[in-house]
């Protein structure tokens, strides 16, 4: 796996980029997406233990099956996405070195590998309960079929559709413990669903020309920056009431969530009239990453000593 390989990046600058088999594997499964979704999966699972007064340490089998199963179905879905999108990935700077584009991994190999990972993930989730596996199926179906194969290349609402799948992980974590979806779990789902839209719209502004070259109808490509900026502000505003539904976690979490929401909204409004749209989009994108990490990690930390 440590064998060094060579990738020719000839389409843009003719330079040679060295990659390893391990690096190719991480790119194939989109390891960044796997990691970020595991944070929200773990948070959903942790809070399910918290609200049900169950022991975390006494249910390590559920913890391991949930995290392993979630990792596998997310990674498998990403591999299938790489397989399907290899024709447009070669047209975009940030995706053109993926192994499905460079030929490091053959399309058929990627497809079957993605299917295998996803199947193994479902088996792992079934070891917790049927509900968790069912929720996982909704996430996979939405991402692979409704987003990747149907809406991504056709409609500007592709971001909204894709955000459904990205909001599923905390529900997987929650249902793996409780077997049903509680109010707090739906709040986590809504936070993740709404959060993704301004997050990815900010990225779409930064990568507008790449999306245009690949003929992907992202909102800034079709309707321009002004419409996209307004949509970002509107979706951030929709986050404002959600922390108040997490009162069961304590006042500090409600305050933290509210402060994070206000901070993001203020950043958006202050920079809304900025002539440097790329600087503004970068600020919004970076803030969104910090928002997710801080808020979801804090929900675990603030309840850390209340779970056995």
UniProtKB/Swiss-Prot annotation:
<comment type="subunit">
    <text>Interacts with CtaA.</text>
</comment>
<feature type="transmembrane region" description="Helical">
    <location>
        <begin position="157"/>
        <end position="177"/>
    </location>
</feature>
<dbReference type="InterPro" id="IPR044878">
    <property type="entry name" value="UbiA_sf"/>
</dbReference>
<keyword id="KW-0350">Heme biosynthesis</keyword>
<protein>
    <recommendedName>
        <fullName>Protoheme IX farnesyltransferase</fullName>
        <ecNumber>2.5.1.141</ecNumber>
    </recommendedName>
</protein>
<keyword id="KW-0808">Transferase</keyword>
<dbReference type="InterPro" id="IPR000537">
    <property type="entry name" value="UbiA_prenyltransferase"/>
</dbReference>
<dbReference type="InterPro" id="IPR006369">
    <property type="entry name" value="Protohaem_IX_farnesylTrfase"/>
</dbReference>
<keyword id="KW-0812">Transmembrane</keyword>
<keyword id="KW-1133">Transmembrane helix</keyword>
<comment type="similarity">
    <text>Belongs to the UbiA prenyltransferase family. Protoheme IX farnesyltransferase subfamily.</text>
</comment>
<feature type="transmembrane region" description="Helical">
    <location>
        <begin position="232"/>
        <end position="252"/>
    </location>
</feature>
<comment type="function">
    <text>Converts heme B (protoheme IX) to heme O by substitution of the vinyl group on carbon 2 of heme B porphyrin ring with a hydroxyethyl farnesyl side group.</text>
</comment>
<keyword id="KW-1003">Cell membrane</keyword>
<feature type="transmembrane region" description="Helical">
    <location>
        <begin position="110"/>
        <end position="130"/>
    </location>
</feature>
<keyword id="KW-0472">Membrane</keyword>
<comment type="pathway">
    <text>Porphyrin-containing compound metabolism; heme O biosynthesis; heme O from protoheme: step 1/1.</text>
</comment>
<dbReference type="GO" id="GO:0008495">
    <property type="term" value="F:protoheme IX farnesyltransferase activity"/>
</dbReference>
<dbReference type="InterPro" id="IPR030470">
    <property type="entry name" value="UbiA_prenylTrfase_CS"/>
</dbReference>
<dbReference type="GO" id="GO:0048034">
    <property type="term" value="P:heme O biosynthetic process"/>
</dbReference>
<dbReference type="GO" id="GO:0005886">
    <property type="term" value="C:plasma membrane"/>
</dbReference>
<feature type="transmembrane region" description="Helical">
    <location>
        <begin position="131"/>
        <end position="151"/>
    </location>
</feature>
<feature type="transmembrane region" description="Helical">
    <location>
        <begin position="60"/>
        <end position="80"/>
    </location>
</feature>
<feature type="transmembrane region" description="Helical">
    <location>
        <begin position="285"/>
        <end position="305"/>
    </location>
</feature>
<feature type="transmembrane region" description="Helical">
    <location>
        <begin position="31"/>
        <end position="51"/>
    </location>
</feature>
<feature type="transmembrane region" description="Helical">
    <location>
        <begin position="185"/>
        <end position="205"/>
    </location>
</feature>
<feature type="transmembrane region" description="Helical">
    <location>
        <begin position="253"/>
        <end position="273"/>
    </location>
</feature>
<dbReference type="Pfam" id="PF01040">
    <property type="entry name" value="UbiA"/>
</dbReference>
């Amino acid at each position: 796996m440590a064998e060094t390989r060579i990738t020719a990046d000839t389409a843009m600058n003719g330079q040679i980029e060295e990659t390893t088999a391990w690096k190719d594997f991480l790119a194939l499964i989109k390891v960044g997406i796997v990691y970020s979704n595991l944070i929200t999966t773990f948070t959903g699972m942790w809070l399910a233990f918290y609200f049900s007064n169950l022991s975390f340490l006494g249910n390590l089998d559920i913890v391991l099956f949930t995290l392993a199963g979630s990792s596998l179905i997310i990674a498998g879905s990403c591999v299938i996405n790489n397989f399907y999108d290899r024709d447009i990935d070669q047209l975009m700077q940030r995706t053109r070195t993926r192994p499905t584009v460079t030929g490091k991994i053959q399309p058929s190999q990627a497809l079957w590998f993605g299917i295998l990972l996803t199947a193994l993930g479902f088996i792992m989730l079934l070891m917790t309960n049927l509900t968790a596996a069912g929720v996982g199926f909704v996430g996979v179906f939405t991402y692979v079929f409704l987003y990747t194969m149907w809406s991504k290349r056709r409609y500007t609402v592709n971001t909204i559709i894709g955000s459904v799948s990205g909001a599923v992980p905390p529900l997987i974590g929650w249902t793996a413990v409780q077997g049903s979806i509680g109010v707090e779990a739906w709040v986590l789902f809504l936070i993740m669903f709404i959060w993704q839209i301004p997050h990815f719209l900010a990225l779409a502004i930064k990568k507008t020309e790449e999306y245009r070259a690949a003929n992907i109808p992202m909102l800034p490509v079709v309707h321009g920056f002004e419409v996209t900026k307004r949509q970002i502000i509107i979706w951030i505003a929709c986050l404002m009431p959600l922390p108040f539904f997490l009162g069961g976690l304590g006042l500090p979490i409600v305050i933290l969530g509210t402060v994070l929401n206000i901070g993001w909204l203020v950043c958006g409004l202050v920079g809304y009239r900025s002539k440097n749209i790329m600087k503004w989009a970068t600020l919004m994108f970076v803030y969104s990453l910090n928002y997710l990490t801080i808020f979801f990690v804090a929900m675990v930390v603030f309840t850390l000593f209340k779970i056995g």
